[in-house]
């Protein structure tokens, strides 16, 4: 009888011990882990893998290999909801990490906090697999070794058994913060040892002004984000104008304006893009006018906006349109340029004044403008 009672008690304590080993934060943290499906240019499934959110507005991390050659990608949350990957925000093919944004369909999503400090050798670690079940069996282990990456970041060797389906799952510390992105085991001991790229290192990946030439990013067909600073983003826009398709360039302009709504250059560039499409459909000119008006509202240097409006109208008239759009005449172009000159008489503005007067066959006025330019500091 005693033996019969002891067996259930032993099982009870074993279950209780197993549950005690699972940290309290696991239940909440597991909801930040998702599955990813990538598709090629023929919209055929390319790869499947894992990733996880690191911000409630849809910022996420995964492995670069999963996205290589992909034209689109979809994440599937632990609740089974599908959301598209909208932007690639940085990648490193050497350490196989990628940062991207998901177009979330909710106000916010569950997200993990990226650890600010690296765990010490010997520290406990937990790997959270993707799961649609209520219960989750996280893998436990230890940090075996910590090595430096790119100066301030880290790469980890873990004493932990990992299955292939756990690649790019988050590796957590005792506080429930993510410090690593699980990577495939390699080498002699793949049973008890696996690796993790630093989550902070993955977060440091970004788009720069020169990213258009980055081979790793070029191998991904999904749209790229903009650099985080205005100056870098403007250089990126300039370079993209000659290398992207018209449709992709327009989307990039929209992104710039969303990211930097107080920067007049975004509206000016998009206005010029709209105007270039207006020959066959004049509603594009309406859009250009709306952007010019917005540029005037936000610009700190309104003379630059007036100059660009005049310059565009001048170029429009030089193209000899069959029917002039509203007031886009040489006279209106001249009016805008002279408003720019009234604010700041820069030689480039006066040069444009001369060009417009010359086009109007006001040669005396054009000569007077050109003579001013010739006596300026740019002559």
Task: Tell me the role of every PLM-derived stretch.
Residues 261, 300, 343-345, 375-378:
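Short coil turns that delineate tetratricopeptide repeat
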Residues 21-22, 39-57, 63, 82-84, ...:
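A conserved glycine-rich beta-strand in the N-terminal activation segment of trypsin-fold
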Residues 272, 276-279, 311, 318, ...:
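Residue-level recognition of tetratricopeptide repeat
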Residues 55-126, 133-137, 152-153:
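Conserved active-site neighborhood of the chymotrypsin/trypsin-like protease fold
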Residues 243, 277-278, 282, 316, ...:
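Structural motif corresponding to the intra-repeat A-B loop/turn of tetratricopeptide repeats
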